[in-house]
Amino acid sequence: MHRRCAGPIGIGQKVIVRETLPNGVKLIAQEMTGFRSVSMAVWIQAGSVYEIGAESGISHFIEHMVFKGTESRSASDIAAEMDAVGGSINAYTAKECTCFYAKVLGENIDLAADMLSDIACRPSLDPADIEREKGVVCEEILMLEDDPEDLAHETLSTVIYGDSPLARPILGTQDTVRAFTRDDILSYMDKRYIPQNMVVSCAGNFKMEELRAAVNKRFDRRGRGDSYVPQKNQLIKEKCFRAVEKDIEQVHICLGFPGFPGDTEEQFALLVLNNALGGSMSSRLFQKIREEHGMAYSVYSYPTSYSDTGYFTLYAGTGEKQAAKVVELMLREIDSVKKDGITKEEFARSKQQLKGNYLLGLESTASRSSSLGRGELRGRIYTDEELIRRIEGVTMESVQDIIPRVLDTERMAGAFVGRVNKRETEVKRIFETA
């Protein structure tokens, strides 16, 4: 399959090329002349939503293990070869995918392709390395538990998705991680790490013919595949509240609301609403809670979208004695938006901010490669012109339409981390009467 998408905005950008190569890998790439760098990423449909029972955390564990060595490179070789050309290589695991990515000068694209394919398709998985890395990942789990802001967001995710696959923790638990064996890892990779589940994205200074040949040749891993399809994710249907007691100075507050999948008209309207409510320094939450009342240093909002669902988060970190008041202020701003909507000035400013953020991101090959890869995973690639058109197509009416659907306090989820036991009754009363 070969499809070209025009991409006229941006200096030196050529058409976006989408292909399914003979080896089964989906390739999505855009040459960007005038840049010295090239960014390449490998996206694999292997994340916590695909894990069952004792597999919890295995996608993330594999992300760690592949950097410990391959059939042809040791861990030190991987670092030394990339350092020698001034490049970088890294990875992350998300709910719905694992991503390995590299950035090098255009002249070193062959090295990037070779190294990314090596770690994704031919890791050595030495048993001694596996046992050692279990300790590293368990420490990462403890580190998350010691970071109250991250813990609040993670807790909100588990609360808002209940029994759905998206509630599963990316890191797993210490018990599941400690139990992983080499056979477990190989079995999971045989199911998920196959060309049909892989997308390779690339943007920057490269030649399409050379890239195509390199990806088709090197990404040759074979496995049995997997017929498992995660159950449909569903948000909670009623209010839900969870408090995590931590002996720390601040209380970290997350309020969660229904959102939308990524490729929907509603999601673009939510992006505009987010900027006005808490997504910028000029937003209502920032101005009210930080600037006017001085009750928080960090206060913001953001939407999260997945393939079949999404949610909207409001966050603030504040002193224990002010926690109830901050929740009250957050809910007051929500009520104001539900009653009167956002102003024409907020609407215009939010749309312009979205366009500006996107266009500035085009100046990075890494940002472009990431956008292409995520778009391919979601099944829809936007050219620059199309995306700007989608943003400009958001109307005041479309934002008004989603406000009661998103800011539905009857389906609000709450996650609170800190010294909450003393204040839980007060905070819970405000939360439950909203």
State where each predicted segment sits.
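N- or domain-start disorder-to-order transition segments that initiate the globular core
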Residues: 8-37
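His/Glu-based metal-binding/catalytic segments typifying zinc-dependent metallopeptidases
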Residues: 41-43, 226-283, 390
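Active-/binding-site microenvironments in catalytic and ligand-binding cores
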Residues: 36-38, 92, 206, 234
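A short local loop/turn or secondary-structure capping micro-motif enriched for an aromatic residue
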Residues: 36-38, 109, 263
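M16/MPP (pitrilysin/insulinase) zinc-metallopeptidase core fold and M16-derived inactive scaffolds
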Residues: 39-103, 279-295
